[in-house]
UniProtKB/Swiss-Prot annotation:
CDD domains in the cross-refs: 7tmA_MWS_opsin
Protein name: Rhodopsin
Membrane topology designation: Multi-pass membrane protein
A single Gene Ontology CC term: plasma membrane
Length: 354
């Protein structure tokens, strides 16, 4: 083995030289230079600085404006809550640990941070799955004129929590475990060891199949069918400027969704799977740290892509920030008129991303 395994940690460095120390008790500056930990700390501070207000404003504006409390926006609200959850319960701990060069909260704190980070990330991921399914059902109409109601939204939110808990809770109960990863400043599921005492191998396989591969397949299938359906509708209505506009908007949104999904999650999952599949292989702490922090940045990408590009929400947010008046003149009446003007067989409410 090219690493050093302890009771609650795995350091990606052999202890032949005797320099390896517990990541819960000593700075890990033998893994990376102090300035690298400073960069990590600054990066986490930036994510908090951007992620907290964006997600907080999403929650606040939705509560303030009744017209935003639609069934579909329940899922978007759940997504913002999950991101906010990650920022408060995960990013702050990682930043504090990076300042000290090791996971200063101890093994118990590692389990708590690992649980909350995993829970928030999984809620966000499964919220994207529910959004993809909703868009597919409404636009592609596999079930005729299906209407996404409040009950469906509540069930969708409940589903995201059930799936997230089914991933985050098992390590707390003895199926796998949470340990410090990368530069030892944040915690996640143990991909590094087989650890037969906690059946680690079976849990990692379960996690990759159920909580990564399946969501990825669902998202690609739903948005792939969505693009095809909108293109077919546009081809049948060449004279409809509204349909052409809808096609471009949906295509753009789908490309952004897929690209940022891949940027956020595929590097992390790929590196984790490589480490798990090559037990004992030599790799540095940076190898796992970089993709892990790409995944963390999803807390910023998600609200920007799924909510900030929504015209109605954007107008409501501007109104809230400007003390009840939109300086750009976008009021409810003009929004309503626009909605009526844009009505067609493939309406903007059916094909818009939110």
């Amino acid at each position: 083995m090219n690493g050093t395994e302890g009771p609650n940690f795995y350091i990606p460095m052999s202890n032949k030289t005797g320099v390896v120390r517990s990541p819960f008790e000593y700075p890990q500056y033998y893994l990376a230079e102090p300035w690298q930990y400073s960069i990590l700390c600054a990066y986490m501070f930036l994510l908090i600085l951007l992620g907290f207000p964006i997600n907080f404003m999403t929650l606040y504006v939705t509560i303030q404006h009744k017209k935003l409390r639609t069934p579909l926006n329940y899922i978007l609200l759940n997504l913002a809550f999950a991101n906010h959850f990650m920022v408060l319960c995960g990013f702050t701990v990682t930043m504090y640990s990076s300042m000290n060069g090791y996971f200063i909260l101890g093994a118990t704190g590692c389990y708590v941070e690992g649980f909350f980070a995993t829970l928030g990330g999984e809620i966000a991921l499964w919220s994207l799955v529910v959004l993809a399914i909703e868009r597919y059902v409404v636009v592609c109409k596999p079930m005729s004129n299906f209407r996404f109601s409040e009950n469906h939204a509540v069930m969708g939110v409940a589903f995201t929590w059930i799936m997230a808990l089914s991933c985050a809770v098992p390590p707390l109960l003895g199926w796998s475990r949470y340990i410090p990863e990368g530069m030892q400043c944040s915690c996640g599921v143990d991909y590094y060891t087989l650890k037969p005492e906690v059946n680690n191998e079976s849990f990692v396989i379960y996690m990759f199949v159920v909580h990564f591969t399946i969501p990825l397949i669902i998202i690609f299938f739903c948005y792939g069918r969505l693009v095809c359906t909108v293109k077919e509708a546009a081809a049948q209505q060449q004279e409809s400027a509204t349909t052409q506009k809808a096609e471009k908007e949906v295509t753009r949104m789908v490309i952004i969704m897929v690209v940022f999904f891949l940027i956020c999650w595929v590097p992390y999952a790929s590196v984790a799977f490589f480490i798990f599949s090559n037990q004992g292989s030599e790799f540095g702490p940076i190898f796992m740290t970089v993709p892990a922090f790409f995944a963390k940045s999803s807390s910023i990408y998600n609200p920007v892509i799924y909510i900030m590009l929504n015209k109605q929400f954007r107008n409501c947010m501007i109104t809230t920030l400007c003390c009840g008046k939109n300086p750009f003149g976008e009021d409810d009446a003009s929004s309503a008129a626009t909605s009526k003007t844009e009505a067609s067989s493939v309406s903007s409410s059916q094909v818009s991303p939110a």
